[in-house]
Regions:
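Canonical tetratricopeptide repeat
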Residues: 50, 84, 118-119
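Register position in tetratricopeptide repeats
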Residues: 57-58, 91-92, 124-127
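Conserved structural position within tetratricopeptide repeats
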Residues: 70-73, 106-107
Length: 127
């Protein structure tokens, strides 16, 4: 009986270890090419931007668009909200509007690698 419990414990431990090792590979905690960005804690548009990020991750493009627009209204210089709005607009095939937002994000945060090195932003700005 003791040997069965030890075997089960070993299998469970290996399973947990495998899941933990795979976490970084599957995007857990890493940014993909079109990941929405959280805003800095000091931003007046933080709540709406971060709410928009949640909806964006769920594929609710139109709902996230509304939150990103509110965030920009609260803080017009919030580069992350402009970038995120560009992502949402791109998903809804509103490419001209998306390009405008990506350009604004790049203008506001020229040294932010999450924005300036974004493949989707580069694709739009090259259009």
């Amino acid at each position: 009986m003791k040997q069965v419990f030890l075997s089960m414990g070993l299998v469970l431990g290996l399973l947990i270890f495998g899941v933990a090792c795979d976490y970084g590979k599957s995007g857990g905690g890493t940014q993909t090419a079109d990941s929405a960005l959280m805003s800095p804690p000091s931003s007046a548009g933080r709540t709406d931007n971060d709410e928009g990020v949640g909806h964006y991750k769920q594929g609710h493009w139109d709902v996230s668009e509304g939150h990103f627009r509110k965030a920009i209204k609260a803080d017009p210089n919030l580069a992350e909200a402009h970038y995120n709005l560009g992502l949402a607009l791109d998903k809804m095939n509103k490419h001209e509007e998306a390009t405008t937002e990506f350009k604004k994000a790049a203008e506001l945060a020229p040294t932010n690698p999450a924005i300036k090195d974004s493949p989707i932003l580069k694709k739009h700005i090259a259009m």
